[in-house]
Amino acid sequence: MEVTGISAPTVMVFISSSLNSFRSEKRYSRSLTIAEFKCKLELVVGSPASCMELELYGADDKFYSKLDQEDALLGSYPVDDGCRIHVIDHSGVRLGEYEDVSKVEKYEISPEAYERRQNTVRSFMKRSKLGPYNEELRAQQEAEAAQRLSEEKAQASAISVGSRCEVRAPDHSLRRGTVMYVGLTDFKPGYWVGVRYDEPLGKNDGSVNGKRYFECQAKYGAFVKPSAVTVGDFPEEDYGLDEM
């Protein structure tokens, strides 16, 4: 198997399982831990993450290694495009049992009974401290979000409605216009600045999802983050439209 010198952030692999006879082609981030990777595989093969054993095979179907370190990154193994990851299920389900849904027993379970079970996704995530059960990570993410919101609020407070401004677009081009709105919105979290451009370089008419924030012509309105806005003496540019 050929492994590139500089690994891409994602990798395309084939997923096979001891529970069925087909393969799935999927793309995953190399930054996933094996524990997180198993959780994603649950939706692909139907096996509980806590009952999985993973094996890595090359594009030539040669066995390379087991993926058995829960806290190791997927990218720390010699995984490259075209490899196959085989899931061995230890839950006791027979081959093909998940392929015919008519054979799957349908039942309901109370939240209390589900909480007591040890082979569920929830119990696995709790033991591995993943997702909402990683209190330290969640606290860190909440603190970072609060910090970003505080910084955006400070930047927004320096921008006044009616001010002339220059906006740095994602392609780094500069666009001039007038500030028409500053504050929170319903369409996305955080603080936003509504701008009426001098030219039809925007994406809306001052409204988003049926709610109007300011008035302007179609394609002249845009909402940008405060960090992309510079207020000052930016007169409307003369494009020579009055010249003969």
UniProtKB/Swiss-Prot annotation:
Top-rank taxon: Eukaryota
Primary localization class, coarse: cytoplasm
Alphabetical list of SUPFAM superfamilies matching this protein: Cap-Gly domain, Ubiquitin-like
Annotated GO biological process: cell differentiation; nervous system development; post-chaperonin tubulin folding pathway; tubulin complex assembly
Modified residues (N-acetylmethionine): M1
Entry annotated with the keyword Acyltransferase: no
Residues carrying N6-acetyllysine: K219
Entry-linked Gene3D superfamilies: CAP Gly-rich-like domain, Phosphatidylinositol 3-kinase Catalytic Subunit, Chain A, domain 1
Traits of the deletion mutant: Mice display significantly longer axons than wild-type mice. Overexpression of Tbcb causes microtubule depolymerization, growth cone retraction and axonal damage followed by neuronal degeneration.
PROSITE patterns given in the database record: CAP_GLY_1, CAP_GLY_2
All residue ranges annotated as the CAP-Gly domain in the record: 183-225
Record's comment on post-translational modification: Phosphorylation by PAK1 is required for normal function. Ubiquitinated in the presence of GAN which targets it for degradation by the proteasome.
Phosphoserine: residues carrying this PTM: S65, S110, S128
The entry's keywords: Acetylation, Chaperone, Cytoplasm, Cytoskeleton, Developmental protein, Differentiation, Microtubule, Neurogenesis, Phosphoprotein, Ubl conjugation
Tissue specificity note: Widely expressed with highest levels in brain. Broadly distributed throughout the neonate brain but restricted mainly to ependymary cells in the adult brain where it is concentrated in the cilia.
Subcellular location: Cytoplasm; Cytoplasm, Cytoskeleton
MF GO annotations: alpha-tubulin binding
InterPro entries, sorted: CAP-Gly_dom_sf (IPR036859), CAP-Gly_domain (IPR000938), TBCB_Ubl (IPR045172), Ubiquitin-like_dom (IPR000626), Ubiquitin-like_domsf (IPR029071)
Task performed by this protein: Binds to alpha-tubulin folding intermediates after their interaction with cytosolic chaperonin in the pathway leading from newly synthesized tubulin to properly folded heterodimer. Involved in regulation of tubulin heterodimer dissociation. May function as a negative regulator of axonal growth.
Family in the record: Belongs to the TBCB family.
PANTHER family: DYNACTIN 1-RELATED MICROTUBULE-BINDING, TUBULIN-FOLDING COFACTOR B
Protein's UniProt name: Tubulin-folding cofactor B
Gene name linked to the record: Tbcb
